[in-house]
């Protein structure tokens, strides 16, 4: 019964928020146009940067995809994973070490570091600065994997991998706040 009430309440709230979709769309559209016209800077790097992201809120398997890429690449390349570190209690650039906790770097980067102790895992809200600091501190770094990077346009990855959940197709959804999409489909 509780699930039904919650579902109905969420449907009602999304209908109430529907007029705000236009405002959200305009903000996202303008921001993207500023990047597209080079009025806001997007930096590319002279080594491979692979971004993994999605258009919708919620879990689509970004961290498992990062882990899959780590498994593929770590035998051949010196790699680093850079995440925002969602939910962490620290600020700025933090590189994981033996004594770093999930409170300092966030749950998902901590999970990645525990599974792959030989790779570099770092967190920074500013992806551009994070990549620069990773390269400065690790001159032999060859590949950077960006976790949840699709909306962070200050960095232009050489390859972007966009994930979706097979149950929640983009074509069946609308923008926030009435829907789950962070970006317009196009």
What are these regions (language model features)?
Residues 6, 73-74, 116:
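Alpha-helix C-terminal capping segments
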Residues 21, 28, 50, 67-71, ...:
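N-terminal, well-ordered alpha-helical segments
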Residues 32-98:
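Walker A (P-loop) phosphate-binding motif
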Residues 7-48:
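A transmembrane-helix-recognition feature enriched in membrane-embedded lipid enzymes
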Residues 86-115, 119-186:
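Phosphate/Mg2+-binding loops and adjacent switch elements
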